[in-house]
């Protein structure tokens, strides 16, 4: 089982200036569910796995929480590694780059629509 995260392009209608969602995928990534406890410890479980449940629908809304989560991950590597999956599928060394890359994509595409599939 895994988590898939997506960013989709949103465009502005030139006539009425309303936002229109598109199916144009700007970013996607996948990570194992085995990292959910590490995400919780870093304070970003809901932001990654269930953004719609906390009112997040644009990438801009993820920038600060993900940045804070990365700070926590990097400040406490020893503690965070205690959440490594014993089977090797879900390690700190995989999770940190996943969150960093997702943050970079959110920063690059702040108006993008966020979607998470579990």
Model-assigned labels for residue ranges:
Residues 1-118:
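Acidic (Asp/Glu-rich) sequence patches and key acidic residues
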């Amino acid at each position: 089982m895994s988590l898939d995260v997506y960013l989709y392009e949103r465009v502005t209608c030139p006539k009425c200036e309303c936002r229109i969602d598109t199916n144009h995928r700007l970013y996607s990534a996948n990570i194992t569910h085995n990292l959910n406890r590490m995400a919780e410890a870093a304070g970003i479980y809901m932001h990654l796995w269930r953004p719609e449940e906390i009112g997040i629908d644009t990438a801009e809304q993820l920038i600060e929480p993900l940045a804070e989560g990365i700070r926590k991950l990097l400040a406490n590597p020893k503690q965070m590694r205690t959440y490594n999956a014993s089977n090797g599928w879900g390690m700190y060394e995989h999770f940190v780059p996943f969150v960093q890359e997702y943050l970079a994509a959110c920063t690059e595409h702040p108006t993008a629509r966020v979607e998470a599939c579990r």
